[in-house]
C-alpha cells in the first residue's frame, strides 16, 4: 500500500483536513492522526507502515483513495477515464446557430467578419434532421444549444427544428436544450415559449455595470442594451416566484477585463436590489486575448483569481449560497465539446466545426452536410481529441491534474493561449475553502460531525 500522488493536507479553522484531487474525497483527521500522517501523506508513492495507524483509519483512507495499492498506476487510470469520456458515444451534442445575424454590434465579436446576415435554410435543416436520425439507435441523449449571432432573431426556426428533433427522438432518446442569448429579446412571452421548447438553461452575458456594458454591448444603432435586459429579467420575476413553474435556469456570464473589473461587485449588489439573484446565477468569466501580451486590457491570472474570490465571497454574503462556478472541486475528463466525440457546432450554411469560437470561419470547418468530411481540416479535430495532458511533463507531475486536465480549452491551447497553473491551483483551493465555509459544512466541521 502506498500514498496517492494527489493528496492535500491542510488546516481549516483549527481542524485537520485531507483532500484527494483524483477521488475528490475529503476527510477530517484528529490531531493524533494528523501528526502521524503529516510526514508522508502528501508525498508521492510512499510505502505505508500500517502498524502505526489504526485499522479503521487505513480502511477509511483507502476507501477515499488517499492510500492505494502498490501496483496501481494513477496516471494510467486518469488517461483511461479521459479517453473513455472523450469517446463516449451515448450522447450527441449540437450547438446550432440558426443565424449569424445579430441585433448587437459588439466591437470584439469574433463573428463580425463572418456573413452576419446568413439565416438557416430549409436544406440545412433537412441535413440536420438526417444527421440526427443517423445517430438514433446509438445515442441515449440529444442535447441542443441554440447559439448565434442572436438565436432569438430566428425563434420560428427554433420552434420548427425543435418539433422535428423531438419527433425524431420520440421515446427512444432523451431531448434537452439550452441557449446563449444577449437577452435583449428575452421578454416574458419569449421565456415561456422557450420553456415549451424544452430549453432548460439560458446564458446571458454582461460586460459590467450600465455605462461599460452599454459601451461594448450596444445595439446596431449604437444605443445601450443594459436597461432593456434588466427590465426583461424583472418582467418574469413573478414566474420564478412560483416554484411549480419548471422554468429555464438563467446564468449571467460577467465578462471581466481590466476596464470593467471594478463594476462586478457593484453589479451583483444592483441585481440584489432588483431581487434578481433569487433566480439568476452570476459568475465571473475571464476574458483572454492572445495579442494582449502585457495585460493592457486583460487581467493577469493572479489578479483574476483574487477578484473571483472577492466576488464569490460577496455573493455568498448577499445570498447565503455559492456562485454556480464556485462549487466543490470535481474531477473532469473531457474539457468541452472540442474534445468530445459526438459534439459539433453547426452554422447557418451547414458547415460543421468542433469549437464555438471557430463558427463562421470556413477555414476551420471540418465538413458540411452537403459534401461530408473535409480531409484538409479534419486533422484539427484529431488534435483536439487526441491531446493528452498526462504526456506534458509539467501536467503529469501536477497534483491537481484530475481537476484540470491541461487547464485550458483545446482551441486556446492550439492557439497558444496557455493557462496559469498557479491561478488554477489558487482557484481550486479557494473553491474548496468556500465549500468549507458554507454554513452547514462549517458547522459540521466545527462540531466534528464531519465523517471520513
Predicted regions and their residues:
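N-terminal [4Fe-4S]-dependent radical SAM core
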Residues: 3-28, 53-95
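Radical SAM enzyme [4Fe-4S]-AdoMet core and its adjacent flexible, acidic
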Residues: 211-339, 347-349, 365
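Flexible mid-to-C-terminal extensions adjoining Fe-S/redox cofactors in radical SAM and related proteins
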Residues: 5, 359-452
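Short acidic, hydrophobic short linear motifs in intrinsically disordered regions
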Residues: 36, 41-52
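C-terminal accessory regions of radical SAM enzymes
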Residues: 316-360, 391-411
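Short glycine-enriched, charge-decorated loop/helix-capping segments at active-site entrances
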Residues: 113-117, 215-223, 415
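Non-cysteine beta-strand/loop elements that form the S-adenosyl-L-methionine
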Residues: 191-194, 199-210, 279-287
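Conserved alpha-helical substructure of the radical SAM core
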Residues: 76-192, 197-200
Amino acid at each position: 500500500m502506498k500514498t496517492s500522488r494527489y493528496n492535500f493536507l491542510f488546516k481549516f479553522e483549527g481542524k485537520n483536513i485531507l483532500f484527494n484531487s483524483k477521488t475528490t474525497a475529503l476527510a477530517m483527521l484528529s490531531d493524533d492522526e494528523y501528526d502521524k500522517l503529516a510526514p508522508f501523506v502528501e508525498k508521492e508513492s510512499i510505502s505505508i507502515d500500517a502498524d502505526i495507524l489504526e485499522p479503521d483509519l487505513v480502511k477509511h483512507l483507502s476507501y477515499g483513495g488517499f492510500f492505494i495499492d502498490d501496483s496501481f498506476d494513477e496516471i494510467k487510470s486518469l488517461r483511461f477515464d479521459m479517453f473513455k469520456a472523450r469517446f463516449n458515444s451515448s450522447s450527441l451534442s449540437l450547438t446550432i446557430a440558426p443565424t449569424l445575424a445579430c441585433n448587437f454590434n459588439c466591437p470584439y465579436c469574433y463573428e463580425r467578419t463572418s456573413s452576419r446576415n446568413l439565416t438557416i435554410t430549409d436544406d440545412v435543416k433537412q441535413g440536420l434532421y438526417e444527421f440526427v436520425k443517423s445517430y438514433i439507435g446509438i445515442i441515449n441523449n440529444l442535447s441542443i444549444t441554440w447559439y448565434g449571432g442572436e438565436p432569438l432573431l430566428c425563434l420560428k426556426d427554433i420552434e420548427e427544428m425543435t418539433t422535428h428533433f423531438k419527433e425524431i427522438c420520440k421515446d427512444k432518446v432523451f431531448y434537452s436544450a439550452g441557449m446563449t442569448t444577449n437577452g435583449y429579446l428575452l421578454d416574458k412571452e419569449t421565456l415561456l415559449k422557450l420553456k415549451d421548447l424544452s430549453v432548460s438553461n439560458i446564458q446571458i452575458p454582461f460586460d459590467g455595470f450600465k455605462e461599460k456594458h452599454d459601451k461594448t454591448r450596444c445595439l446596431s444603432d449604437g444605443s445601450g442594451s443594459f436597461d432593456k435586459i434588466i427590465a426583461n429579467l424583472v418582467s418574469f420575476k413573478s414566474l420564478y416566484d412560483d416554484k411549480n413553474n419548471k422554468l429555464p435556469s438563467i446564468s449571467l456570464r460577467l465578462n471581466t477585463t481590466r476596464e470593467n473589473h471594478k463594476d462586478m461587485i457593484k453589479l451583483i449588489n444592483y441585481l440584489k436590489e432588483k431581487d434578481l439573484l433569487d433566480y439568476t446565477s452570476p459568475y465571473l468569466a475571464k476574458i483572454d486575448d492572445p495579442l494582449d501580451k502585457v495585460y493592457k486590457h486583460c487581467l493577469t491570472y493572479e489578479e483574476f483569481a483574487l477578484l473571483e474570490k472577492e466576488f464569490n465571497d460577496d455573493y455568498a454574503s448577499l445570498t447565503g449560497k455559492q456562485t454556480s462556478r464556485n462549487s466543490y472541486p470535481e474531477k473532469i475528463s473531457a474539457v468541452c465539446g472540442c474534445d468530445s466525440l459526438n459534439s459539433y457546432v453547426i452554422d447557418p450554411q451547414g458547415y460543421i466545426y468542433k469549437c464555438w469560437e471557430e463558427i463562421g470561419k470556413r477555414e476551420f470547418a471540418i465538413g458540411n452536410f452537403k459534401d461530408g468530411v473535409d480531409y484538409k481540416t479534419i486533422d484539427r479535430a484529431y488534435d483536439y481529441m487526441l491531446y493528452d495532458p498526462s504526456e506534458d511533463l509539467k501536467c503529469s507531475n501536477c497534483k491537481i491534474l484530475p481537476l484540470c486536465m491541461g487547464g485550458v480549452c483545446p482551441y486556446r491551447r492550439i492557439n497558444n493561449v496557455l493557462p496559469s497553473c498557479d491561478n488554477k491551483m489558487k482557484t481550486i483551493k479557494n473553491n474548496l475553502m468556500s465549500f468549507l465555509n458554507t454554513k452547514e459544512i462549517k458547522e459540521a466541521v466545527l462540531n466534528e460531525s464531519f465523517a471520513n
